[in-house]
């Protein structure tokens, strides 16, 4: 009978866990819908910012301004990359499957790839889980910030990027990339790697065209060309990080929703298995008691 009591306790414990994981799934689903809407709107703004950026560059080129001296386009002179800063974004919490692990693996892979080319790499971390991992493994992270990936805030993202931009403009780093796990759809996340500095590829490797939505974008230069580029570049760099934070949060809720759904289903299966075991043990106990009773009756005859 002690065995039956143990099985009953296990069934009760698993059912409690099932209720918790189901509740967490519902919460994540609700948060995901909100985060997805924010991500969609933020992406629209990011695309519009890119359109304005291309619009201004196109107008400048049409005016015959080829020699741009903006401080954000230093790669026109700095052709060799020797130092790279990697900004990684992970969650502040766990229970989201391989969400954080996949991001960390990509960071390590990129780090090793750069080091094989004799390129110095510095890490800058956003998110408790990633920062804890690298700290535990003795890997230096230059800048650490928590409670930002779980609550994206433009002002805090802007403040974080100030030091990054200062290091780039002073020559302490030649390239800055952002690595995060992004939202693709309700059930899929994908690792995204984006170069935010240098941004001169807009001129070197692309041929910026005037915006096709002139009725909504009328970016007429006011001030020097370099001032305009500097202003747009600052906004582009800051918003690139902010959008990555929003995109990462949506992906985190998606991953947690899936993880909790899987955990809930596994708990259901385990309850079924334990219930079968309980019924078998109960039947065996009843059979044993009947055999003992019959044996006692026979002994009295």
Curated annotation (Swiss-Prot):
InterPro entries: ATP_synth_F1_ATPase_gsu, ATP_synth_F1_gsu. The keyword Transport applies. GO terms for biological process: proton motive force-driven plasma membrane ATP synthesis. CDD domains: F1-ATPase_gamma. Pfam families: ATP-synt. It is found in: Cell inner membrane. Keywords: ATP synthesis, Cell inner membrane, Cell membrane, CF(1), Hydrogen ion transport, Ion transport, Membrane, Transport. Gene3D superfamilies: 3.40.1380.10, ATP synthase, gamma subunit, helix hairpin domain. GO terms for molecular function: ATP binding; proton-transporting ATP synthase activity, rotational mechanism. The keyword Nucleus does not apply. GO terms for cellular component: plasma membrane; proton-transporting ATP synthase complex. It is a peripheral membrane protein. NCBIfam families: ATPsyn_F1gamma. Belongs to the ATPase gamma chain family. HAMAP family: ATP_synth_gamma_bact. Produces ATP from ADP in the presence of a proton gradient across the membrane. The gamma chain is believed to be important in regulating ATPase activity and the flow of protons through the CF(0) complex. F-type ATPases have 2 components, CF(1) - the catalytic core - and CF(0) - the membrane proton channel. CF(1) has five subunits: alpha(3), beta(3), gamma(1), delta(1), epsilon(1). CF(0) has three main subunits: a, b and c. This is ATP synthase gamma chain. It comes from Helicobacter pylori (strain J99 / ATCC 700824) (Campylobacter pylori J99).
């Amino acid at each position: 009978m002690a065995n039956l009591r143990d099985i009953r306790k296990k069934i009760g414990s698993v059912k409690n866990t099932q209720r918790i994981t189901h509740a967490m799934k519902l919460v994540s689903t609700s948060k995901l819908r909100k985060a997805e809407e924010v991500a969609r709107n933020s992406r629209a703004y990011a695309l519009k910012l890119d359109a304005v950026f291309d619009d201004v560059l196109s107008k400048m080129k049409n005016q015959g301004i080829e020699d741009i001296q903006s401080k954000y386009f230093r790669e026109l002179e700095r052709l060799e990359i020797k130092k790279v800063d990697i900004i990684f974004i992970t969650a502040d919490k766990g229970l989201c499957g391989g969400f954080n692990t996949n991001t960390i693996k990509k960071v390590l892979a990129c780090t090793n790839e750069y080091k094989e080319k004799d390129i110095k790499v510095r890490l800058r971390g956003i998110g408790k889980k990633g920062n804890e991992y690298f700290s535990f493994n003795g890997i230096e992270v230059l800048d650490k910030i928590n409670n930002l990936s779980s609550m994206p805030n433009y002002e805090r993202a802007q403040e974080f990027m100030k030091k990054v931009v200062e290091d780039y403009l002073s020559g302490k780093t030649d390239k800055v990339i952002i690595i995060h796990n992004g939202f693709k759809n309700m059930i899929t996340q994908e690792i995204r790697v984006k170069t935010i500095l240098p941004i001169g590829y807009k001129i070197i490797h692309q041929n910026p065209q005037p915006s096709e939505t002139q009725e909504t974008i009328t970016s007429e230069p006011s001030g020097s060309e370099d001032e305009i580029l500097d202003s747009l570049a600052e906004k582009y760099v800051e918003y690139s990080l902010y959008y990555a934070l929003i995109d990462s949060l949506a992906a985190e809720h998606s991953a947690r929703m899936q993880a909790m759904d899987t955990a809930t289903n596994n708990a259901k299966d385990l309850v079924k298995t334990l219930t079968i075991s309980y019924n078998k043990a109960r039947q065996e106990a009843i059979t044993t008691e009947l055999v003992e009773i019959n044996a006692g009756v026979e002994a009295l005859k």
